[in-house]
A protein has these predicted regions:
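Extracellular/periplasmic carbohydrate-active domains that bind, remodel
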Residues: 3-345
Length: 345
């Protein structure tokens, strides 16, 4: 049967080396179980490298260049200082696995301006390392300006995470346009990451035809693109026992979003925090979302402020569960429990 073709890898992989490389790299592009030089050399031609890595560099200018069809991530500045990416174009097929346009990881003092990104995965993505490795490195991505960029296809227009274990802070995003990205503004992480994301300011964003959320906070991220994961899988992870807060607990706080216009979306907004570490102190104001299939859903959040929000949808505009100190156009809801509450703006 056609559905069985992928499982019969020994038939359609071109060589034994390519099959071995694929099996060794189930965890993205990190080979597992490779112990000798001979084993490494056998699978090396079949790995998918990043197209451009810039590592531990200072005063970098990347300007006026076009990149196409990267095997994996396209642009990956890592641990750089004073880096400017200006008037760059990235074109990856929509189906390219892990085909991120830009992954700015653990960089300091960066300008991302006047670019066009068309990606097979996240477009403009802020990262700082994954799990224990990222926490040990301890290099937050910080002091970043993202301005006047256009994103065509992508899993997210502007994204933080999910690899944010070293922290993210002092990020300013303004005057960007997202045309048909799966999600507009996307914040994602999961238990085990650790790290703190704070001091994010987003202003003046225009979006058109967003299939899923215009704004998404998901701390139960399961490694799949928006829309690919079954609702049952997400609910299953959310029903697991609540662990203690440790260094492995990610935290998202002090995030301020304003002047957002979106014409066409799936769910307008989704705040999905952790029971042990809710999303805290997020302000969203001056937002217009037309033709949304669903409204706003908030779960596990504290100190969220919604002000001057206009959402055009057929159902309830605001569905809230497990939230504290929610402020909607000046009215404060000190506590809403698991039973939930339907509200309107």
């Amino acid at each position: 049967a056609a559905s069985d073709v992928y499982k019969r890898q020994s038939i359609w992989y071109p060589t034994a080396g390519s099959l071995k490389g694929a099996l060794a790299c189930k965890n993205f592009n990190n080979p597992e179980g490779i112990e000798t030089d001979e084993e490494w050399n056998e699978i090396r031609p079949w790995l998918r490298p990043v197209l451009l890595n810039i590592v531990k560099s200072k005063r970098v200018l990347l300007e006026g260049v076009t990149f196409k069809n990267s095997p994996s991530w396209c642009l990956h500045p890592l641990s750089c200082e004073h880096i400017t990416i200006n008037q760059v174009k990235v074109f990856n097929p929509w189906y390219s696995q892990n085909g991120d346009a830009l992954d700015l990881e653990s960089c300091k003092n960066a300008l991302i301006i006047n670019n066009i990104f068309d990606a097979g995965d996240d477009a403009i993505c802020i990262k700082s390392g994954k799990d224990e490795d990222g926490r040990k490195r301890g290099e937050p991505c910080q002091n970043v300006i993202v301005k006047n960029n256009t994103v065509l296809h992508g899993h997210g227009g502007f994204v933080v995470g999910s690899e944010m274990s070293g922290g993210v802070k002092n990020i300013y995003v303004t005057d960007c346009t997202f045309l048909g990205t799966d999600v507009g503004l996307r914040f994602k992480s999961t238990r085990g990451r650790g790290g703190v994301v704070e001091g994010i300011y987003i202003h003046n964003i225009h979006m058109i035809d967003i299939p899923h959320e215009a704004l998404l906070f998901d701390l139960f991220y399961g490694g799949k693109a928006a829309g690919e994961e079954m609702e049952e899988d997400l609910k299953g992870r959310m029903k697991t026992a609540v662990p203690q807060v440790t260094v492995e607990t990610p935290s998202f706080r002090d995030i301020h979003i304003s002047n957002i216009i979106c014409k066409g979306s799936g769910r307008a907004m989704f705040f999905n925090g952790l029971p042990e570490m809710p999303i805290r102190n997020v302000t969203v104001k001056d937002v217009i979302i037309n033709d949304a299939k669903e409204g706003v859903v908030i779960s596990q959040a504290e100190g969220v402020t919604l002000e001057n929000i206009r959402i055009e949808t057929k159902g309830h505009t605001l569905d809230v569960k497990n939230a504290k100190n929610l402020k909607v156009d000046g009215k404060v809801y000190s506590a809403i429990g698991a039973e939930g509450k339907m509200l309107d703006f």
